A protein has these predicted regions:
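Charged, helix-prone or intrinsically disordered regulatory segments positioned adjacent to compact structured domains
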Residues: 4, 10-13, 21, 64, ...
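Short basic helix-loop element that most often maps to the first helix and adjoining turn
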Residues: 12, 16-37
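Conserved hydrophobic/aromatic packing and binding residues within compact polymer-binding modules
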Residues: 19, 30-34, 45-51, 66, ...
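Recognition helix of helix-turn-helix/homeodomain-like DNA-binding domains
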Residues: 38-58, 79-83
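Long, hydrophobic alpha-helical segments
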Residues: 59-63
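Short, charged, amphipathic alpha-helical segments
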Residues: 141-149
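Short, charge-rich amphipathic alpha-helical segments embedded
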Residues: 152-157
Length: 157
C-alpha cells in the first residue's frame, strides 16, 4: 500500500526511460529490481542504471524478466519499430506522458480495408475510451497508467 504517491516522470521515449517510469510507478528501487533479477556484487544496481540511462539495452529474456517484475506488458517496454503500425500505437500512448494534453482523434479517419489501419484505429479508440474515463474521474490516474502499462493490442479484429 502506498502512503505517498509521486507521479513518475518520463524523460523521453527511449526504452530506458520507459523502464524507469514503470519501476517508479511500481514504487520500486533499482536495488529491489536488481535483487529480484538475481544481480549480485557491490554494483548490482549498475545494470539497471545502464538500462534506464540507455547505455545498455536488455536482451529479450532479461526484458521479459523485468516486465514480469514490474507487472507490465512487455510491449510497454520493448524497443519500438517505427515501421510497425502496432508499435506506433504504443508510442502514442507514451507520448501522452511527455505531452499531457496530446490527443489523437481517429473518429474522422475513413474505414480502410487495410488490416493494420483497422487494428490501429480500434486500439486508439480503446485508448480514447480510457482517456475519457480518466478525464471524467471514473478511474484514477494510477488505474489509467496501470491500463496503459498492461494494454495489449489484439491483432485479430
Amino acid at each position: 500500500m502506498r502512503l505517498l504517491y509521486t507521479k513518475p516522470r518520463l524523460n523521453d521515449l527511449s526504452q530506458g526511460s520507459r523502464i524507469a517510469f514503470a519501476r517508479q510507478f511500481r514504487t520500486m528501487s533499482q536495488d529491489e529490481v536488481s535483487d529480484i533479477l538475481g544481480l549480485t556484487g557491490e554494483c548490482k544496481r549498475r545494470t539497471m542504471t545502464r538500462y534506464e540511462k540507455g547505455d545498455r539495452n536488455p536482451k529479450l529474456k532479461r526484458l521479459e524478466e523485468i516486465s514480469s517484475i514490474l507487472k507490465v506488458n512487455i510491449n510497454s517496454l520493448k524497443e519500438y519499430d517505427f515501421n510497425n503500425p502496432i508499435d506506433v500505437v504504443y508510442i502514442f500512448m507514451w507520448m501522452e506522458e511527455l505531452i499531457p494534453n496530446y490527443v489523437i482523434d481517429v473518429s474522422k479517419v475513413p474505414r480502410v480495408d487495410e488490416y493494420y489501419i483497422d487494428v490501429v484505429k480500434k486500439s486508439i479508440e480503446e485508448w480514447t475510451d480510457m482517456r475519457i474515463k480518466r478525464l471524467r474521474k471514473e478511474i484514477s490516474y494510477e488505474d489509467y497508467i496501470e491500463w496503459k502499462l498492461n494494454y495489449e493490442i489484439k491483432e485479430k479484429l
